[in-house]
Amino acid sequence: TFYASPAATTIRSWVERTPKGFIFSLKLPQEITHEQRLRDSTGASETFFERARELGGKLGPILVQMGPDFQPGELPALVDFIGRAPSDLRIAIEFRHRGWITDGVLALLSEHNLALALVDGRWIPRKLMLSLAARPTADFAYIRWMGPNRDLVDYSRVQVDRSREVDAWSDAIEELSEKVSHIYGYVANHFSGHSPSTARDFQSRLGQTPVDPDLLGEQMSLF
């Protein structure tokens, strides 16, 4: 949904075609975050949120991913957007400029129960992100493991050993789980080369039963 807001009929078809218990995580369209930069976006935002509600109980968090060129000088646009954010939806905001990580911004997010997206990537140091995991700004948490390896092109196997990072984040998640009701985690292939393997590593480290890939059917298409 980052590239365009789906039609309501499309979203309803997702509900019908996915199994019970399936949870969707959406991303606010780039038209709002990157083109309009949150300014004058009331109509587009309200349309997107209304369509997201079509998912009903299958709707998980909505990510508002801002680009690295969205800088603290644009705080008024952020404040206005946050003031309009619907309280019935779980919304996480991702900053890729370190200047946004301030006590004031964290307090603003907390006031509106918006999660600061915790991202292990190349924009903000991992050490800082891990420390922020101990200071959740909402009653849920949103974590993305992106990785810095944008040159990886083979996604069929693990190519980077991330066991130390998995251990560090697992410790943070165990502590975080005592402070929030839900933790949503998403792994990109650029993190280790093969995101399903990384997800299984996290499951094992956190005492969960890893999903056996041999038991999975062919991945469905939503389009």
Question: Which stretches of residues belong to each language-model region?
Answer:
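Residues lining hydrophobic/aromatic ligand-binding pockets adjacent to catalytic sites
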Residues: 1-223
